[in-house]
Amino acid sequence: MDKNLNQLLKWSIEAQTAANAGQSHHSHGAPTSNNSGPAAGTGAVATSPAPQVTGSGPRPVDPEILASLFGGPSEAELMKAAMEVITDPSPETTRENKLIAFDNFEQLIENLDNANLLDQLALWSPLLSLLDHEDEDMRYHAAWCVGTAVQNNQKTQERLLAMGGVPKLVDLAMKEGESEKVRRKATYALSSAVRNYQPAMDVAADEMHKRGHEVLLSNGTKVDAADMDKVDEVIDCLRNKAKSA
């Protein structure tokens, strides 16, 4: 990944973290001033060409990184950068930063064109591998992103199925000992994966059957992926199982 893009993403994460901390501090009664100028004691000088950031605020972004920003990194580059942060094994990349990057990634793939780029950018494999992550919140966000990527999108539904993602989602949605929030988010992703896409519905039904849950109509026929009422019955059953987890 481009060095400037990587630093820009890190700066963005730092800025968001600092903003969240600042809001929390202000809400707990931080003193205010009626002076329209800089608050006393902050060390900020209105005429300074390079204001210093104090405390836990982000470090000033250098001109090279700004040039990268104004050069317009594509959303595809931002998707790759976010996934690099999410999967970075380095202890320097904190869990909080990974979750922020996950939020950014999910917002990017809300766009249909960006979701379709997951295959071209080779991002399906790392995303699906995160469904098995040891951290509950990482599994939760991974399932969320999968659900966003395949919602009302047959192209990504096909890729998810081809990459073996449907059995993974069924396993996560029905796994004993898994948290309710992860199971419910996996159920959401599975719902998006099977609607109006019969191959995924058939695989999901087969995987659920293996785990002791029959997904057949009263006459023994398969659930029609285009029948939203019947699909809802299957998904509601999984949601109810998650509640009892």
Regions found by a protein language model. Name each.
Residues 123-128, 165-170, 204, 212:
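HEAT/HEAT-like alpha-solenoid repeats
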Residues 17-21:
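Low-complexity, charge- and small-residue-enriched intrinsically disordered regions
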Residues 2-14, 24-28, 34-38, 43-60, ...:
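Alpha-helical solenoid repeats of the armadillo/HEAT superfamily
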Residues 64:
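Internal, Lys/Arg-enriched amphipathic helical interaction segments that engage polyanionic partners
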Residues 83-134:
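Onset and early core of a folded interaction/catalytic domain in large eukaryotic regulators
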Residues 126-129, 141-148, 168:
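Generic beta-strand or strand-like secondary-structure segments
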Residues 115-119, 154-161:
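Short alpha-helical interface patches
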